[in-house]
Amino acid sequence: MIKLVFALRRRPEMTLDEFQTYWRETHAPLVAERAEVLQIRRYVQVHTTDLPGLHAAFQKRNGGAPEPFDGVAELWFDSLDVMGGDDPAVRQAQAELLADEANFIDLPNSPMWMSEEFEVVGLTQT
């Protein structure tokens, strides 16, 4: 399995609550509806918890730190091969999701990358 990680920053005019509500209640169903055609095996939203003083503590610990992301999307696929291709249905689903992402994500400041997990501690460890 391969995982797409998308570190999200909200559009500047949105509050954290507005961003997270839109992501959870509007965008998530769009992803779920397109999961089969896109061959998404798993989709997880990681929502930032805004705890007073926590970011300042992290900045102090790390000797400075950029502003945290507003959330992280994690999408699992069987392989890179299923993510591309010339299938019009796949291209259409990708375009629809990208169009919706522009409604709530600051896309130029939200990096994404492909990753492979190496579990160190967890339930599946033997």
Regions found by a protein language model. Give the residues of each.
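Macromolecular interaction modules
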Residues: 1-126
